[in-house]
């Protein structure tokens, strides 16, 4: 893709593919020092409805002294896009990241993730701490705090109603309408080059990304299944979600979908935690607040 190369020709982006044991092929962009074998590796994991390109401002910053690998999750952009909902179970996406890291050479210096990429990476950090030295997560809640908020907090329940809409059959067809207007409205102000990049990604298909919502047990109650969110909380075992990897949370406090309450009690589930809140920042802080985000990440990586 030409867009980021035109913005930062010195990045020398390379394309790489990773093949998993269950036949999934994951597309990635790689950049960084030519002596990649000596440079520590950072793995970037995007969310919905984005792809590797969402990290372009971080790639420009950290490729100066790190080998940077930004993947497309299964179901997104140039990675494999199985159509069945069951192919997007969280355990399978965690296994995808394990395969990528093992092929890169475990452990990576850090996993840096956002939104759905963060959800998968929270599980990776809890289940496979040996695969990463550090974990950075941007506006993506821990499963336990998210489940509790969906069950008990009216404001977060209201903010998360979009999840139930996306879970409906045919939601991806609606997202395509009017040149992806709903998705562009969601992402906010973009340049013409950025719009072209996202449009090209979405033209590969949206079903995979939407299937993440369909398969997830974490969503607000529906009229058909009242009380389900509370049942999910009761079924969760906190010890399985305990994170011991040194973790840096970067949180935009004005995110309309993921509210600050999702950080309440997070220290109970992460033993080595730093939290940096950005007032006035929303959900897309890697792009909209890149300077501050990059400063926080760099300081944490060096600590």
Residue ranges of predicted features:
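Serine-hydrolase catalytic-loop signature spanning alpha/beta hydrolases and amidase-signature enzymes
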Residues: 49-57, 68
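Catalytic histidine-centered segment of alpha/beta-hydrolase-like enzymes
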Residues: 281-294
């Amino acid at each position: 893709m030409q867009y980021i190369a035109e913005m930062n020709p010195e990045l020398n982006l390379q394309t790489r593919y990773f093949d998993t044991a269950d036949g999934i092929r994951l597309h990635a962009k790689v950049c960084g020092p030519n002596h990649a074998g000596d440079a520590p590796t950072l793995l970037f994991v995007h969310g919905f409805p984005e792809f590797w390109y969402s990290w372009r401002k971080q790639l420009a910053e950290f490729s100066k002294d790190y080998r940077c690998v930004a993947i497309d999750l299964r179901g997104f952009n140039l990675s494999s896009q199985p159509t069945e909902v069951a192919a997007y179970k969280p355990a399978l996406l965690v296994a995808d990241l394990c395969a990528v890291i093992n092929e890169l050479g475990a452990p990576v210096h850090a996993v840096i993730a956002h939104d759905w990429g963060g959800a998968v990476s929270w599980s990776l950090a809890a289940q496979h701490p040996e695969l990463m030295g550090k974990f950075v997560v941007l506006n993506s809640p821990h499963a336990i705090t998210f489940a509790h908020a969906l069950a008990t907090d009216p404001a977060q329940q209201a903010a998360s109603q979009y999840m139930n809409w996306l879970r409906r059959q045919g939601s991806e067809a609606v997202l395509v309408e009017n040149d992806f207007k709903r998705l562009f409205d969601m992402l906010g102000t973009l340049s013409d080059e950025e719009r072209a990049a996202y449009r090209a990604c979405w033209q590969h298909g949206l079903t995979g990304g939407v299937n993440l919502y369909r398969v997830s047990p974490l969503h607000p109650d529906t009229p058909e299944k009242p009380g389900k969110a509370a049942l999910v909380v009761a079924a969760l075992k906190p010890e399985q979600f305990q994170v011991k990897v040194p973790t840096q949370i970067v949180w935009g406090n004005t995110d309309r979908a993921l509210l600050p309450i999702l950080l309440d009690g997070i220290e109970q589930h992460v033993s080595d935690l730093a939290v940096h809140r950005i007032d006035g920042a929303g959900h897309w802080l890697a792009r909209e607040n890149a300077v501050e985000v990059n400063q926080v990440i760099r300081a944490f990586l060096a600590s």
